[in-house]
A protein has these predicted regions:
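Cytoplasmic helix-loop-helix junction between adjacent transmembrane helices
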Residues: 87-122, 316
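Helix-to-loop junctions at the C-terminal end of transmembrane segments
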Residues: 42-54, 249-261, 346-347
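Helix-loop-helix hairpin linking two adjacent transmembrane segments in secondary transporters
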Residues: 124-170
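Extracytoplasmic gate region of multi-pass secondary transporters
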Residues: 10-14, 192-250
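Hydrophobic core of transmembrane alpha-helices in multi-pass small-molecule transporters
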Residues: 80-96, 208, 288-302
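A late C-terminal transmembrane helix in Major Facilitator Superfamily
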Residues: 128, 317-349
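Structural signature of the two symmetry-related core transmembrane helices
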Residues: 57-71, 264-278
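Extracytoplasmic
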Residues: 1-25, 46, 217-222, 338
């Protein structure tokens, strides 16, 4: 259900939204960035609710909010309210929906945490593979606002299914006393202690950057297809391949981290992004774009498991909700920065291809920082 608040879904409507509200690339990017930034701030507080509320109670509230947000997008006639619409979608969809799933699985599964996170993220991957093609096809038949009404209906239908599936859910309180997993130095770290540790800050550029520029790429998918001279449908037709690679990478990374831990994997998981964005920058054929999607999928799949397991493995599970809420807020902030930055740079005349060269350089630097941070903390990490 988080798909309705994800960039890959919202950005499909970018052309229609810009036309309806008479927005430039920079205007739309700024509005999207502002709404996403506000949701990042809200996540710092709301994310901690997973430490005190059961998913069975919190989940339906979030899904109801997501359904209302979809209706808000469908019926909002004023550009002044568009940042509020984006905030609601991003907070309830990208923010809380994914956060609840990741924290629940990270807390409930210790020995098989990687596999559990892989399974939890299959829903996201399925949505990423199917919704873009479906929505582009539906937009040929219906007005775009009607598709958002359909999204709201789907979100409402998912509420009773969630309640039924979690009818015997374990509570955060029971997990705090029975199945704790400690972090570095054999202890449970609080949010403030985590923020004071250098490892957190060595990892942040990579986590924020991946969110920022992956979001920016899908946010500008319509513009990207235009400058390459491709039909938009040709581009979204590659999404299932991207998603298939991401699913394979997600499962493989989940299995590997259960066997060897995150420390040996996480410094290298963004290396494919370097070459993906170089292909997007310089490639002019659909084949080059397809190879770029394959490389992008390798990192996106690993992102579904490695960062979530990283927080639990290094800082323990007792305060995982609040710790991951902070990290999630930072990543949501990144997803606000990416579209806003690329949109403004486009308005100032910097071509998207040139921006993607800079993005590839960024991922090289962030991978180096991760390697340094993990190497410094290795002796403190539980085995």
């Amino acid at each position: 259900m988080s798909s309705f608040g994800q960039t890959y879904f919202i950005s499909i409507f970018a052309g229609e939204i810009r036309t309806t509200f008479d927005l430039s690339h920079g205007d739309w990017g700024a509005i999207y960035g502002f709404g996403t930034f506000a949701s990042a701030i809200a996540m710092v507080w709301a994310g901690g609710l997973t430490d005190i509320m059961r998913v069975r109670r919190l989940g339906p509230i979030v899904l109801a909010a997501l359904a209302a947000s979809c209706l808000f997008m469908a019926f909002n006639p004023w550009v002044a309210l568009l940042p509020v619409v984006i905030f609601c979608l991003r907070f309830s969809g990208q923010g809380m929906s994914t956060h609840i799933a990741a924290v629940g699985m990270s807390r409930w599964f210790a020995a098989n945490r990687g596999k559990a996170l892989s399974v939890a993220n299959l829903g996201f991957s399925i949505g990423e593979a199917t919704y873009p093609l479906l929505v582009v096809a539906l937009m040929m038949l219906f007005v775009w606002q009607g598709i958002w009404v359909l999204a709201a209906f789907i979100a409402v239908l998912s509420i009773p299914a969630l309640v039924w599936l979690l009818r015997e859910e374990r509570s955060p309180e029971s997990m705090a006393t029975e199945d704790q997993s400690v972090g570095m130095n054999g202890r449970h770290w609080t949010r403030n202690q985590t923020l004071a540790h250098p490892l957190f800050w060595f990892m942040m550029p990579a986590f924020v950057g991946q969110s920022a520029f992956n979001t920016a790429f899908f946010f500008l998918q319509v513009h990207f297809s235009e400058i390459k001279g491709w039909d938009h449908f040709q581009l979204v037709a590659m999404f299932p391949i991207y998603t298939g690679v991401a699913i394979g990478s997600m499962i493989l990374s989940g299995v590997l981290l259960d066997k060897i831990g995150t420390a040996r994997l996480i410094p290298y998981f963004q290396l494919p992004m370097i070459f993906a964005f170089l292909l997007f920058a310089y490639g002019q054929s659909l084949l080059a774009a397809l190879l770029g999607f394959v490389l992008l999928g390798l990192t996106s799949g690993a992102t579904a498991t490695l960062p979530n397991a990283f927080w639990a493995e290094n800082f323990g599970t007792k305060h995982l909700g609040s710790i991951k809420a902070t990290a999630a807020a930072a990543m949501v902030l990144g997803s606000a920065i990416g579209p806003a930055l690329t949109g403004v740079l486009l308005d100032f005349g910097l071509p998207l291809e040139a921006q993607y060269v800079g993005v590839s350089v960024f991922f090289g630097a962030s991978s180096l920082l991760m390697w340094v941070g993990v190497s410094r903390a290795r002796n403190s990490t539980p085995t």
